[in-house]
Amino acid sequence: VAPVVPDLSSDIDTSNFDDLEEDKGEEETFPIPKAFVGNQLPFVGFTYYSNRRYLSSANPNDNRTSSNADKSLQESLQKTIYKLEEQLHNEMQLKDEMEQKCRTSNIKLDKIMKELDEEGNQRRNLESTVSQIEKEKMLLQHRINEYQRKAEQENEKRRNVENEVSTLKDQLEDLKKVSQNSQLANEKLSQLQKQLEEANDLLRTESDTAVRLRKSHTEMSKSISQLESLNRELQERNRILENSKSQTDKDYYQLQAILEAERRDRGHDSEMIGDLQARITSLQEEVKHLKHNLEKVEGERKEAQDMLNHSEKEKNNLEIDLNYKLKSLQQRLEQEVNEHKVTKARLTDKHQSIEEAKSVAMCEMEKKLKEEREAREKAENRVVQIEKQCSMLDVDLKQSQQKLEHLTGNKERMEDEVKNLTLQLEQESNKRLLLQNELKTQAFEADNLKGLEKQMKQEINTLLEAKRLLEFELAQLTKQYRGNEGQMRELQDQLEAEQYFSTLYKTQVKELKEEIEEKNRENLKKIQELQNEKETLATQLDLAETKAESEQLARGLLEEQYFELTQESKKAASRNRQEITDKDHTVSRLEEANSMLTKDIEILRRENEELTEKMKKAEEEYKLEKEEEISNLKAAFEKNINTERTLKTQAVNKLAEIMNRKDFKIDRKKANTQDLRKKEKENRKLQLELNQEREKFNQMVVKHQKELNDMQAQLVEECAHRNELQMQLASKESDIEQLRAKLLDLSDSTSVASFPSADETDGNLPESRIEGWLSVPNRGNIKRYGWKKQYVVVSSKKILFYNDEQDKEQSNPSMVLDIDKLFHVRPVTQGDVYRAETEEIPKIFQILYANEGECRKDVEMEPVQQAEKTNFQNHKGHEFIPTLYHFPANCDACAKPLWHVFKPPPALECRRCHVKCHRDHLDKKEDLICPCKVSYDVTSARDMLLLACSQDEQKKWVTHLVKKIPKNPPSGFVRASPRTLSTRSTANQSFRKVVKNTSGKTR
């Protein structure tokens, strides 16, 4: 994108281009040739006849009369010719004089034009230098503004660092609170010891408890050693704090030395600035002198131009007069020539004596020609002299031009010196500004360091007081311990209970230590992140400087457009006033609409609350009814089973009695064959009855099992429906939160002039909400099955996962996590996710949460390949694993044998409730298998892997979710569970485990 996009009024808009003046070069003047050519002189031609045949044939009398007449005519003609020749000669002289004047005036004009061109070039050069200086001034102003922006950015960074320091101080206060809690625990221990002493007073008589007392003695010594280790740790912390204090003192002294050096540099710089200011004043005086000379030259140029214009006017007038006179003379000449020809014809016809007169006239004409030739030679000599003078003038001109060039060179050198001095001045002024800014920043840092030193001293004093108190308490405890050594031998059975409490205390202390260690690690990570951010900011600074240099050029163009924009802004101000009046009306309408929307939202919220209450009541009633029905059914089934068992036992007992009554001694007693037959018949009847009763019993069991399966399936469906409703409710609540935030933004913006843009409204959304695209693993093996993209929304209470944006619009999430059940959020390492690619690892992060905080849709997994024995199949809550039975086992669904010694049929076993069944039942989708009776442990922890689009987004998500983690652990959950079940503990608990769903994993 270009740094500046100018507004164009049309396709032929060239207002953004500068009008460049064409460089008018010096006019080419060819020198006058010194050799005489003669092509500028007029040609005069005449004709004559050499034969005298006309004279021989004429009479002498006729010749005399004609000669008299011809003489008179000839004299008149000669007079006219003389007059004409004199006029011609005068006009030729005038013409030569005018031509000489024109040449001299042209030479003068050429000189003046050259001088004017040189002065124009000098003026243009000066104007260009002035414009360059102005541009440099604008660039310097732009740089100053940029440095101010950079200073503001550094101030913001410093504020951020101060905020982090404040957070670290808060953590220190938390540690102090922990130490106070330990003191309270010590007080509790002392109270318990007093109770033990009272118990010892009561039970001194018993001597059998000596061994137990010795054990308690050793345990107390261990507790004292633990307290001593705690004391040592506190002493070490105190030493660390003292070392940090000494380091801060050293830094303070170093900063003071740097400040003094900078003050010295500042004094030196101020002296340099004074010298430069003196130089600037001298240069300004020189510039004024040059300007004065320029003004004089311009005045002379104007006078010369006026003279030139006047001479041009005179020249034009003379040319017009000469042309007019030449034309009139040519016309007269033509008329006289014609008349002369006519008279010649007449004279030839009438008189032959005129030829003699002509010969005389010709002689006279030859004399005149000779005179004219002599005059011409004189004129040529004059021309040669004039050319010599011209050559001398050319030499003088060249000398004057060389002098001018020398002067222009001196002028350019002076201008270069002026430019260099101005540049030095600007550089030194920039250095001065930079030094002033650095002094200010260092003074500010020194003040901050002083404040930090005071705070550190206060903290050290508080820690020393705490140390003294602990030492005093230790001394008291040692005294009590020495006094109680004799009494310890007579402690009794109540000590076991107290030992239990002490073990609980130890576990709490361990947990607190682990939490402190985790906080320290997090602080180290934060410091590393800050260092990385510092490096990235340095690179960004370099990029910003390069951008600034490119923007400086754009700034010049923008400042040229500024004047036009100010004029347009005045026009736009009047328009804005009208628009503001219109927008005030729209604001009132929007406020009315806002009030209506708030009312609608309140109504919706009330309806939502009522619906949730109704749902809860209906769920409770349904649960009670289901429990009553199940209890009644269980009681009825138990009664039937008991009665059938009693009947069965009675029948078996009868059979045993009958069998016992038989006498197998044939030799002694020979029973009758009829009695035997009767007994056999009775036995058969009894066996038939038994079989019938067994069949009835089996039918009843199958019926009841089917009913139970149906009830459990209904329960599962209703639970799934309830989960879906809860998920939809959560998504609706997040949408309502977003709408409320937007409404608050609208209510805050009272005037239309301060209405935020679309970008600002997006930026003003509450910090509790974040949304975007994240990827979730399809199954356990990421390398084989890959990732699945989901749209994730984090509201103030829930984390919602959508398959796509349509599901988000329809408020149909695939999974919802409760933020209150979050334990931990962290970026993942190579050891955690060894199946993922190395490029993806910096983008992956892990969420640890309680199982009870998860709510998802029941999506049945795809059939798993037989090769993967570690994978399992989900069906009605079961997690079936494929197995083979070589020992006796029956199917729990169809009661058929499930085993064979050599070729057992394919079987499945639930790894939760250990129900066995044939694989065919699940493949054929038979409804014989009852739902799983064993559910997940609600208090078990679970983790989820999430893949962000980039590393920056991963950091953003992690920091946001870390802020969301509740400080108190979820109710009903063991605090140590997520730590003991960490992903990096053992190979069995690594990510090689099979995931239950697309993202979750049972821990």
UniProtKB/Swiss-Prot annotation:
Residues 128-205 form the REM-1 domain. Its main location: cytoplasm. SMART domains: C1 (SM00109), PH (SM00233). Residues 356-595 are annotated as: SHROOM3 binding. GO terms for molecular function: ATP binding; protein serine kinase activity; protein serine/threonine kinase activity; Rho-dependent protein serine/threonine kinase activity; small GTPase binding; zinc ion binding. GO terms for biological process: actomyosin structure organization; apoptotic process; cortical actin cytoskeleton organization; embryonic morphogenesis; mitotic cytokinesis; myoblast migration; positive regulation of focal adhesion assembly; regulation of actin cytoskeleton organization. Residues 71-341, 660-751 form a coiled coil. Autophosphorylated on serine and threonine residues. Cleaved by caspase-3 during apoptosis. This leads to constitutive activation of the kinase and membrane blebbing. Residues 1-58 form the AGC-kinase C-terminal domain. Residues 16-28 have a biased composition (Acidic residues). Keywords: Acetylation, Apoptosis, ATP-binding, Cell membrane, Cell projection, Coiled coil, Cytoplasm, Cytoskeleton, Golgi apparatus, Kinase, Magnesium, Membrane, Metal-binding, Nucleotide-binding, Phosphoprotein, Serine/threonine-protein kinase, Transferase, Zinc, Zinc-finger. Residues 979-1003 have a biased composition (Polar residues). The modification N6-acetyllysine is found at residue 296. It catalyses: L-seryl-[protein] + ATP = O-phospho-L-seryl-[protein] + ADP + H(+); L-threonyl-[protein] + ATP = O-phospho-L-threonyl-[protein] + ADP + H(+). Its cofactor is Mg(2+). Residues 767-966 form the PH domain. Residues 764-1003 are annotated as: Auto-inhibitory. It is found in: Cytoplasm; Cytoplasm, Cytoskeleton, Microtubule organizing center, Centrosome, Centriole; Golgi apparatus membrane; Cell projection, Bleb. The modification Phosphoserine is found at residues 754, 757, 977. CDD domains: C1_ROCK1, PH_ROCK, ROCK_SBD. One of its GO terms (cellular component) is bleb. It holds the Pfam family Rho_Binding. The C-terminal auto-inhibitory domain interferes with kinase activity. RHOA binding leads to a conformation change and activation of the kinase. Truncated ROCK1 is constitutively activated. Homodimer. Interacts with RHOA (activated by GTP), RHOB, RHOC, GEM, MYLC2B, RHOE, PPP1R12A, LIMK1, LIMK2, TSG101, CHORDC1, DAPK3, PFN1, PTEN and JIP3. Interacts with ITGB1BP1 (via N-terminus and PTB domain). Interacts with FHOD1 in a Src-dependent manner. Interacts with SHROOM3. This is Rho-associated protein kinase 1. It comes from Pan troglodytes (Chimpanzee).
